[in-house]
């Protein structure tokens, strides 16, 4: 007697943020109790169960597939891996196709001949509906098994029931098929409760109490017939629960005598399970894969293409059946079972099998990452310094290492690792000598081959790199740790080629071309084969989680991400990263490219498991996402390659920009502006001198008029004239002194404006908690500036609550 369980999950992005909580707090407990695993992790030998999964989406063009299902498995660990690897994407605009998902579960539970006696011989059947959206309100064409009635005249009514139905109508069929229906929802939606009530065996029975104190907003409804699930949430456990319920004992005892005949009849009737030929890969032992029949229309891509488990090839894999392709039809499996994808080495894993059809672009993604890292030379901890006033970042973020680094077509043998790169050919030139391009006959001298075979480095296409000319700027020693080079002077030297830097906007740089036959890597004339011992350069997976944004203040799942760091970077780089990265704000990429940062930044490569419209909007609008980590700040931008993102990781909760030294052109422009203002000052001085002469002439004219009009008062006027003449120079001196002060005021203002302009250039905004504030550089950087110009220097920021339009 085999008990069966089907988990029907909504695959849209609405359920993504809550999925880990649902699996850890509810599904994990139910499945372990269903498999008979007690608290000591000892599996009961009497447990004979099978589990499967159905994933449904929404109607409309926003979902690639309406309904997908997996095969049956008897391995608990494999099924838990399936659940943890569900790709939640799309949807969110329409109601979920709950009716189609429940109907698919009924098809998987149904008996081919519909015999009631045989149905009684089968074990218990349970279904758990997990959805975060309301069901589609209109009846849709779904398939439901036709239950044979005792009277023949009722067959017509049974045939008419399987045409159009909504979710509640499909749920009413579950009690007729002796299937228990349970519901888990992260929101208390009344329509999902109505579906649960429609699927109850006894509508008047009270719902068993479930402790939801940890998640008060969750709707958890467990069927009264799902004894294992109720025992998983009860503190007393399965033993006390079985002793307190006598109907359970009677049910088990009545079924036990027919267990022998049931196994025979079940094996004879279960013709839907088709054994597949063994699949062998490397050192993995073969295992039988069971595939469900083709009951729905074949589709272009396989369902759950990334669900198979990844384990080291040196360890035995007891159940590859768990990693069987969760497909929609046999036809799809026959086309996709031989497709392999090579992934970067992840903590000792050498090779992973992944049935891929529509996701073939992922092969190019990681190969492109290997090529990008081939030019990086294994060092991602780069001290970003100024090279003669030219920013080193240039178009690193805007191009995203995509336009300059094409996908590789390197041939990898089955015994080699997934990524083979070289670091010995990275140029390191002296300060007094320019490097030259040379074409070595082979890479055996600078990059030894792996496993006795030559390493195919690059194939077709040009990989433009950059060669920094020496300008007396110190070289960061962290860049050389991956190459094993020590004792190099830090005061001089050239920087390593950085992928993604444009050739037009970088003066003093030389492109490094790579053709299809030989790689022209710049090598120093003083470099020998034994001077720089090469090390295998690879990217290591350090993090996997979700990327979410905000829409109207609520978190919205965007995509599933995988983060990769360089082998030379710190192992504890992502030690305290949360499982979900929350985007707090958006900034412009153009502003980032024109700035330089204080301290060092770690470059990381992220791979998006599925494409989302928000990522394409970031690329079109040239925006960069800011993510606040517990002790770091991550700037994330989308590259030109599909599903690839570039991350810049900075320590601390803010990013500090380097002060910009004004170039010679800017100084010349300032001098020209000052010279243009000098003629204006000269004109003002001339006008002031004319005004002084007028003031001097006015008192003399008044005295002459008075002498002509009053001849009788000449004696008195003669006595007063010396006094007035003595007063005129005093008035002239006062007026001249005032005019000189007025002339000095613009000059002082100009002298004060020049230091203010220099201070404004040195004061740069920061990304992080102080996005709308300006901080002083140096020791007093944490003090707020009181100038009114500080608020106008902030980065152009899209409001955090509305960037997910």
From Swiss-Prot:
It comes from the Eukaryota. Residues 438-451, 786-795 have a biased composition (Low complexity). GO terms for cellular component: mediator complex; transcription regulator complex. Signal peptide: none annotated. GO terms for biological process: positive regulation of transcription by RNA polymerase II. InterPro entries: Mediator_Med25_VWA. Residues 430-455, 786-805 are annotated as: Disordered. Interacts with MYC2 (via N-terminus). MED25 competes with JAZ7 for binding to MYC2. PANTHER family: MEDIATOR OF RNA POLYMERASE II TRANSCRIPTION SUBUNIT 25 (PTHR12433:SF11). Belongs to the Mediator complex subunit 25 family. Component of the Mediator complex, a coactivator involved in the regulated transcription of nearly all RNA polymerase II-dependent genes. Mediator functions as a bridge to convey information from gene-specific regulatory proteins to the basal RNA polymerase II transcription machinery. Mediator is recruited to promoters by direct interactions with regulatory proteins and serves as a scaffold for the assembly of a functional pre-initiation complex with RNA polymerase II and the general transcription factors. This is Mediator of RNA polymerase II transcription subunit 25. The lineage of its organism: Eukaryota, Viridiplantae, Streptophyta, Embryophyta, Tracheophyta. The gene is MED25.
């Amino acid at each position: 007697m085999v008990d069966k369980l089907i988990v029907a999950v909504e695959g849209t992005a609405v359920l993504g943020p809550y999925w880990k909580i649902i699996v850890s707090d509810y599904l994990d407990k139910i499945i372990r109790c269903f498999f008979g695993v007690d608290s000591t992790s000892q599996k009961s030998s009497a447990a004979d169960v099978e589990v499967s999964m159905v994933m449904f989406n929404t109607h409309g063009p926003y979902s690639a597939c309406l309904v997908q299902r997996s095969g049956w498995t008897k391995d608990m660990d494999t099924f838990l891996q399936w659940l943890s690897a569900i790709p939640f994407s799309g949807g969110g605009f329409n109601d979920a196709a709950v009716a189609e998902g429940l109907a698919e579960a009924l098809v998987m539970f149904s008996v081919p001949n519909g015999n009631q006696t045989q149905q009684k011989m089968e074990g218990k059947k349970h279904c758990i509906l997990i959805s975060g959206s309301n069901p589609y309100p209109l009846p849709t064409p779904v398939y439901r098994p036709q239950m044979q009635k005792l009277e023949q005249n009722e067959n017509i009514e049974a045939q008419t029931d399987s045409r159009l139905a909504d979710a509640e109508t499909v749920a009413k069929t579950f009690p007729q098929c002796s299937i228990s229906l349970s519901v888990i929802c992260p929101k208390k939606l009344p329509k999902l409760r109505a579906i649960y009530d429609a699927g109850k065996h006894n509508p008047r029975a009270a719902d068993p109490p479930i402790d939801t104190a940890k998640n008060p907003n969750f709707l958890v409804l467990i069927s009264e017939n799902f004894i294992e699930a109720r025992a998983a949430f009860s503190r007393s456990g399965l033993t006390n629960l079985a002793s307190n319920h006598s109907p359970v004992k009677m049910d088990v005892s009545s079924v036990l005598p027919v267990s022998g005949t049931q196994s025979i009849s079940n094996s004879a009737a279960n013709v839907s399970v088709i054994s597949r030929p063994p699949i062998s890969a490397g050192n993995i032992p073969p295992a039988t894969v069971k595939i469900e029949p083709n009951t729905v229309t074949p589709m272009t891509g396989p369902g759950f293409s990334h669900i198979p488990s990844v384990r080291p090839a040196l360890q035995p894999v007891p159940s590859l059946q768990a990693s069987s392709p969760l497909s929609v039809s046999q036809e799809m499996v026959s086309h996709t079972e031989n497709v392999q994808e090579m992934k970067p080495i992840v903590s000792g894993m050498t090779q992973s099998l992944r049935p891929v059809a529509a996701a073939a672009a992922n092969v190019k993604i990681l190969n492109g990452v290997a090529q990008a890292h081939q030019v990086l030379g294994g060092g991602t901890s780069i001290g970003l310094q100024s090279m003669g006033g030219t920013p080193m970042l240039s178009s690193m973020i805007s191009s995203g290492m995509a336009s300059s680094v094409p996908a590789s077509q390197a041939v990898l043998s089955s015994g080699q690792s997934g990524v083979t790169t070289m670091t010995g050919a990275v140029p390191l030139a002296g300060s007094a000598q320019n490097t030259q391009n040379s074409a070595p006959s082979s890479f055996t001298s600078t990059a030894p081959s792996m496993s006795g075979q030559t390493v195919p480095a690059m194939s077709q296409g040009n990989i433009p790199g950059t060669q920094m000319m020496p300008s007396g700027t110190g070289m960061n020693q962290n860049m050389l740790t991956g190459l094993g080079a020590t004792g190099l002077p830090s005061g001089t030297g050239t920087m390593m080629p950085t992928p993604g830097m444009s050739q037009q906007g970088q003066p003093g740089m030389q492109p490094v071309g790579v053709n299809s036959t030989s790689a022209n890597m710049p090598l120093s004339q003083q470099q020998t084969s034994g001077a720089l011992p090469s090390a295998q350069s690879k990217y290591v997976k350090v993090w996997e989680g979700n990327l979410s944004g905000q829409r109207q203040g609520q978190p919205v799942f965007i995509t599933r991400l995988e983060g990769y760091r360089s082998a030379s970077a710190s192992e504890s780089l992502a030690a305290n990263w949360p499982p979900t990265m929350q985007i707090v704000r958006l900034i412009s990429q153009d502003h980032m490219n024109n700035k330089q940062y204080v301290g060092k930044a770690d470059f990381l490569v992220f791979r998006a498991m599925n494409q989302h419209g928000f990522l394409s909007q970031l690329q079109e609008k040239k925006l960069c996402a800011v993510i606040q980590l517990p002790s770091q700040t991550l700037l994330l931008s989308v590259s030109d390659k599909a599903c690839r993102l570039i991350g810049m990781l900075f320590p601390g909760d803010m990013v500090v920009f380097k002060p910009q030294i004004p170039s010679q052109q800017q100084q010349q422009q300032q001098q020209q502006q000052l010279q243009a203002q000098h003629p204006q000052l000269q004109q003002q001085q001339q006008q002031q001198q004319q005004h002084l002469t007028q003031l001097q002439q006015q008192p003399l004219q008044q005295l002459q008029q008075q002498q002509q009009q009053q001849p009788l008062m000449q004696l008195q006027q003669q006595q007063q004239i010396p006094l007035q003449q003595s007063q005129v120079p005093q008035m002239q001196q006062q007026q001249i002194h005032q005019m000189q002060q007025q002339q000095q005021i613009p000059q002082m203002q100009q002298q004060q404006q020049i230091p203010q302009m220099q201070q404004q250039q040195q004061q740069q905004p920061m990304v992080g908690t102080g996005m709308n504030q300006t901080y002083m550089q140096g020791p007093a950087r944490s003090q707020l500036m009181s100038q009114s110009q500080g608020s106008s220097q902030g980065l152009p920021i899209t409001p955090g609550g509305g960037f997910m339009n």
